[in-house]
Amino acid sequence: MGYFQGNDFRKITGGKKGKHRDKRKFELGSPPTETKLSTEELIEKERGMGGNIKIRVKYATFANIYDPQEKVSKKAKILSVIETPANKEYARRGIIVKGSIIQTELGKAKVTSRPGQDGTINAILIKE
């Protein structure tokens, strides 16, 4: 079933409004991409508005970690999701979103990209 993002054809009282047109394709949405920590990577391409391509990370193993001390970026394996300020349940389920604190081979890092929108996981190393 599709995700409709237009007006819901109902009045405040609960009664039905008269439809003046059918639903359009541009009003179609999709469920949130909950990027999960996994042993294998899966990246999906999806058509967006205007024929643009949206790249979504479904399962992730590695992240691009920026070290502000050395001013260099490195690819590192993600070991675990420590904390997620957006939703405490996400950390328990291993879901990575922007702002999540992840444990990598290089140390703790804070995710700066949106994996469900950008198609990659970028993070900045946190000094302890």
Curated annotation (Swiss-Prot):
Which InterPro entries does the UniProt record give? Ribosomal_eS8, Ribosomal_eS8_CS, Ribosomal_protein_eS8_arc, Ribosomal_Se8/biogenesis_NSA2
**Among its keywords, does the record have Ribosomal protein?**
yes
Q: Say if the entry is tagged with keyword NADP.
A: no
Give this protein's Gene Ontology molecular function annotations: structural constituent of ribosome
- Tell me which family the UniProt entry assigns to this protein: Belongs to the eukaryotic ribosomal protein eS8 family.
How it assembles, according to the record, is: Part of the 30S ribosomal subunit.
For this protein, the record's HAMAP family field holds: Ribosomal_eS8
**Name of the protein described by the UniProt record:** Small ribosomal subunit protein eS8
